Curated annotation (Swiss-Prot):
Protein name per UniProt: Large ribosomal subunit protein bL12
Molecular function GO terms recorded: mRNA binding; structural constituent of ribosome
Organism lineage string: Bacteria, Pseudomonadati, Chlorobiota, Chlorobiia, Chlorobiales
Function field: Forms part of the ribosomal stalk which helps the ribosome interact with GTP-bound translation factors. Is thus essential for accurate translation.
Domain of life according to the entry: Bacteria
PANTHER family: 39S RIBOSOMAL PROTEIN L12 (PTHR45987), LARGE RIBOSOMAL SUBUNIT PROTEIN BL12M (PTHR45987:SF4)
Species, as recorded: Chloroherpeton thalassium (strain ATCC 35110 / GB-78)
Length: 127
């Protein structure tokens, strides 16, 4: 068990970029995806009542950088300003496009960030 605890500690020390690279490497090595698995509504007890309720409007959005475009430097500046990442980490996010720039943002903030990225020459979207 000590080796597992040590591994968890080492993973906890990774930067966001390094953690992203680790996830990609594990996905490739083991042929899996880190995407959440969708559960069929009928499989869970009590899901029938939840299925009848009207769909809730989404309140939190992820901003995804699809491509940096021609003016990569301007896009890196916008990513740094929005995320607080250092130059190296922001550059890695831009270089690894398509990548998530920021997660769980309110709709207005996400729209503003997408607009700023597009003005900088990037291709971005809200999910």
């Amino acid at each position: 068990m000590a080796s597992i605890d040590e591994l968890v500690e080492e993973i906890g020390k990774l930067t966001l970029t390094e953690a992203s690279e680790l996830v990609k490497a594990l996905e490739e090595k083991f042929g899996v995806s880190a995407a959440p698995v969708m559960v069929a509504g009928g499989a869970m007890p009590g899901a029938a009542g939840a299925a009848e309720a009207p769909a809730e409007e989404k309140t939190e959005f992820d901003v995804v950088l699809k491509s940096a475009g021609a003016s990569k430097i301007n896009v890196i500046k916008v990513v740094r300003a929005a995320t607080g990442l250092g130059l190296k980490e922001a550059k890695a996010v831009v270089d690894e496009a398509p990548s998530t720039v920021k997660e769980a943002m309110p709709k207005a903030d996400a729209e503003k960030l997408v607009k700023e990225l597009k003005e900088a020459g990037a291709e971005a979207e809200m999910k």
